[in-house]
Amino acid sequence: MPNNIVVYDLLISCPSDVSEYVDILEKEVNHFNNFWGRTNNVIIRTRHWSKDSYSEFGSYPQKLLNKQIVDSSDMAIGVFWTRFGSPTENYGSGTEEEIERMISMNKQVFLYFLDKPISPSKIDHTQYEKIKQFMEEHKNKGIYFTIQDERTLAKKFRENLELYFDSIIRGTEFKKSSVKKE
């Protein structure tokens, strides 16, 4: 018998130093879909520039990505480690622009910062300082998590997905539009 299934698009946003984590996040989404999602008639589709964008001209690249995949996504996950990313026309990086756009549209953003060891010679300190500044700017604007490794990221992300969608199913989702601005 056919089911009515609600499909959500999840934007995966991250600089190049965490691109290997995209596969981990996609596996967690598949796990979520196969168990929690199937039971609750919810499916999440991942979107990432490397597989969901196409060649196009007429504007700067991030603006085209925003049009192609960012603005139509229902939620996003952002992951940072040691690189903040390449600047765009309006932001310090494409990842920052994507996260800020999603927040400004009152869309769900899952945000994680990796705190895993790396050789000091491999760190671009200017990039890392931008991450620390971004964390500082967002510490009183919402909840993010600092995690130590791939396994912890996978576990925490899956837990967050389940908690978030459980709040939607139960009708207790935090209503961003009802927050008073001071």
Task: For the regions a language model picked out, list residue spans one by one.
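Conserved catalytic or regulatory cores that recognize and/or transform ribose-phosphate-containing ligands
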Residues: 1-182
